[in-house]
């Protein structure tokens, strides 16, 4: 791609981003990202979060999802969050900066969870996108498989899993895998998710024993 094409593409993205009504609302409300609205839509539909819950937030930065969940679980709840990128502190959120693909980071995250009964694991993780689906989709699928592995390790029976997945090769198999582990599984495309994006959110509730 030439510099001129890249510049035109970047300009279009910036124009779309700043004219996006959810970006504008997020700025007005002082929210960390437009992702707040995606999780709010999921909560309105599926009633995932309740006061006092312990929640694991993967791919947490800049903090939109954690910021939302704090309002739902209250002071008695707890969020253990992780991201490769830094995140400004949020009261009630225990943040670990590191690469979730790294075994040592995974171990440190499990240590922070400790003996807590985790009621929700949520993942908004995504790889750096190259724009080539043949490269991007396998990278994204690897991350969501790791998130599901975290569910197997820490999620309490009856717990819930919310995960961003990009539709493409491996999606159907992944969905079948989740259906085998949870009693109820929905695929959501929130209004606040950009229409041209391949992303959808799998909302799985009732982890089987």
Swiss-Prot record:
NCBIfam families: PRK11188.1 (NF008390), rrmJ (TIGR00438). Specifically methylates the uridine in position 2552 of 23S rRNA at the 2'-O position of the ribose in the fully assembled 50S ribosomal subunit. One of its GO terms (molecular function) is rRNA (uridine-2'-O-)-methyltransferase activity. This is Ribosomal RNA large subunit methyltransferase E. S-adenosyl-L-methionine binds at residues 63, 65, 83, 99, 124. The gene is rlmE. It catalyses: uridine(2552) in 23S rRNA + S-adenosyl-L-methionine = 2'-O-methyluridine(2552) in 23S rRNA + S-adenosyl-L-homocysteine + H(+). It is found in: Cytoplasm. Its EC number is 2.1.1.166. One of its GO terms (cellular component) is cytoplasm. It comes from Cronobacter sakazakii (strain ATCC BAA-894). Belongs to the class I-like SAM-binding methyltransferase superfamily. RNA methyltransferase RlmE family. The keyword Repeat does not apply. SUPFAM superfamilies: S-adenosyl-L-methionine-dependent methyltransferases.
């Amino acid at each position: 791609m030439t510099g001129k094409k890249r510049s035109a593409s970047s300009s279009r993205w910036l124009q779309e981003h700043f004219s996006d009504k959810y970006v504008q609302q997020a700025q007005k409300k002082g929210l960390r990202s437009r992702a707040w609205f995606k999780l709010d839509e999921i909560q309105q539909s599926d009633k995932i979060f309740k006061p006092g819950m312990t929640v694991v937030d993967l791919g947490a930065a800049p903090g939109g999802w954690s910021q939302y969940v704090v309002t739902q679980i209250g002071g008695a709840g707890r969020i253990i969050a992780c991201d490769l990128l830094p995140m400004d502190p949020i009261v009630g959120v225990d943040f670990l900066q590191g690469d979730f693909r790294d075994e040592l980071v995974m171990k440190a995250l499990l240590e922070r969870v400790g003996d807590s009964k985790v009621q929700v694991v949520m993942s908004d993780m995504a790889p750096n996108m190259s724009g080539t689906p043949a490269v991007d989709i396998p990278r994204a699928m690897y991350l969501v498989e790791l998130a599901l592995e975290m569910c197997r390790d820490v999620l309490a029976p009856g717990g819930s899993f919310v995960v961003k997945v990009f539709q493409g090769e491996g999606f159907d198999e992944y969905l079948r895998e989740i259906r085998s582990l949870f009693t109820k599984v929905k695929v959501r495309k929130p209004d606040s998710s950009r229409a041209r994006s391949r992303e959808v959110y799998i909302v799985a509730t009732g982890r089987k024993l």
